[in-house]
């Protein structure tokens, strides 16, 4: 990576983020690169109590993607030196685990991670560069050995885990996760926002929209896989599935 992280390239302003305990701080700085190119960012991780710098992460992208999470009662930071790699920092010890030397054309861009209560499984929102975001899971039980993808055992395309519409994600327990896909409805007209044209969206921007269930999936870690253990549907979801099946049968 060309060293754009010089004083003359540093842009004014920075953003600060505190860990859940308030004991650690991430400061994100921005650096210009070249005309027509995106900026780079640098994350400086410090111990709030003594001001000691724990780590500096230089990233080749304008957005410094990150999350704090807990593993074994210790606070960790997820970030990345590139937009296709991951770096995990144990904020208590300063240990880093980084896979930026292993990226390839099939590597995913991670946008968000949600750790289970013990910090041993990561639910990840990710995409291939330019592609749709999907939900994946990774084994984070021993980061010194990497974080391997946990495959789905009985994935059901009728309950697709692509991250579109409005969705909710949450851990229900250490091994059970909930994905909920919602429809965003204009309260007065009952019309879904995705069915509205630009004029309708503009004219209703100050109106109230509500989120209603489209479908829901409960996933569980069973052995070495993530399994669909239960699903919940809605009349709108069932109607869409029926239309899709009709289109397939008519071709």
Curated annotation (Swiss-Prot):
It comes from the Viruses. Residues 229-251 are annotated as: Disordered. Residues 234-245 have a biased composition (Basic and acidic residues). This is Uncharacterized protein R762. It comes from Acanthamoeba polyphaga mimivirus. The lineage of its organism: Viruses, Varidnaviria, Bamfordvirae, Nucleocytoviricota, Megaviricetes.
